[in-house]
Amino acid sequence: MFNQPARKERRRVARRKKALAIAPRPAAGSLRPQVRCQTFKYNTRLREGRGFSLDELKAAGINKKEARAIGISVDVRRRNKSVESLQLNVQRLKEYRSKLILFPKKLSKPNKGDATEEEMKLATQLKGKLLPRTAWIKPEKARAITDEERKVKVFDRLRQARAHKRLAGKRAKKAKEAGGEVAGGEKA
């Protein structure tokens, strides 16, 4: 309770120490994907995920081992449920790769794609967020609501669509059983 200000200061100092230790790598840590939050309530929100899926890395042309070495977090359990999210994160990976300055492991023998000495001198540590999130949906301009749009009850329609999806299996089973009884009656 009374150690709150001191704890805040300790965290600040720890963050500064970590940033110095990992310099010239970004202070924010490794690059993370943009993912949608779970559940109907929050699925419009974008947040940072744990790591990029293997499909995203493959589409961006980056090896899993190489990705971890150049500061890209990888989550092998993650699956892409939509093409849009895959494309967004692949674009994110490509943008990161283009801005990246790779220091050679051995200065005497630099590999292909490694930075030159001039580029290495210019390299500075990124202090803020690593590739800040971009808006996924572009907002529409305001316009007048038409009479047809007023007649449609959107909330009810969405609820109905969800109910149809939820009950589709039971309804199909019931229809199949009803169809089987009718066919059975004709045979007898």
From Swiss-Prot:
Basic residues bias: start-end ranges: 165-174
Q: Which UniProt keywords apply?
A: Ribonucleoprotein, Ribosomal protein
User: Per the record, what is one GO cellular component?
Assistant: cytosolic large ribosomal subunit
GO BP annotations, alphabetical order: translation
Q: Give the PROSITE patterns listed for this entry.
A: RIBOSOMAL_L13E
List the Gene Ontology MF annotations in alphabetical order. RNA binding; structural constituent of ribosome
Matching Gene3D superfamilies? 1.20.5.110
Which region ranges are annotated with the description Disordered?
165-188
Is Ribosomal protein set as a keyword in this record?
A: yes
Cross-referenced Pfam families:
Ribosomal_L13e
Where is there biased composition of kind Basic and acidic residues? 175-188
**Top-level division of the source organism's lineage:** Eukaryota
- Could you say which protein family the record assigns here? Belongs to the eukaryotic ribosomal protein eL13 family.
Name the record gives this protein:
Large ribosomal subunit protein eL13
User: Which species expresses this protein natively?
Assistant: Lumbricus rubellus (Humus earthworm)
